[in-house]
């Protein structure tokens, strides 16, 4: 993406962030496969993975992880993708992030604390 101007790059990232929120796995994967950094983030540090996880898109989360997304990158509020998924009740996303080795003790709150708070500790058992 280095051939793009800063404004063009910002626009591509904004589109990709919307694709992550919407769970448009195919199109988002195409963006990443053509050079968009897999850990691209918005101004608040919410990565593509964070937004896909928060909005319950397990397939999109899996596709991003398969392309090298870091499951432990936290946003500017120190929130992790797995804690966000627990907060939103996205059980399948939690399972995908656990399989990817997401750190259950990172962030504020930690995934363990979020699971306890929202009665979802069974998702972290084992």
Regions found by a protein language model. Give the residues of each.
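Conserved ankyrin/ankyrin-like repeat signature
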Residues: 27, 59-60, 92-93, 120-123
